[in-house]
Amino acid sequence: MKKLISILGSTGTIGLNSTIIIDKNKNYFQPYIFIANKNFKKICSQIRKFKPIFFIINDQKTYQKISKKFKKSKTKILSDLDLIKSKKKCDITISALP
């Protein structure tokens, strides 16, 4: 069974290195929650490539652009961490926030 993995700060150096490991081990990991601030290009790329169940974007302007762009995506684009508190627990969390 795949492990649910969350990355807090997915577009930074540690987050990007973590996604490389996920990409090389697709049979072991299911991207669950990715969190980023405002790097539009990297966020778009990660949604397309990894298809996390949730993607939380802290910056409001970026959130609005991304949510419009990916409104038909299976990834749920959110702007508030509180919206996922009631969701199931993930197996692995990588905190890559400064």
Regions found by a protein language model. Give the residues of each.
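N-terminal Rossmann-like dinucleotide-binding module
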Residues: 1-51
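Structural motif
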Residues: 8, 34, 58, 78-80, ...
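Glycine-rich nucleotide/cofactor/substrate-binding loop typically near the N-terminus or early
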Residues: 32-39, 43-72, 76
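A structured beta-alpha segment of the ubiquitous adenosine-cofactor-binding alpha/beta core
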Residues: 67-98
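Residue-identity detector for threonine
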Residues: 11-13, 19, 62, 75, ...
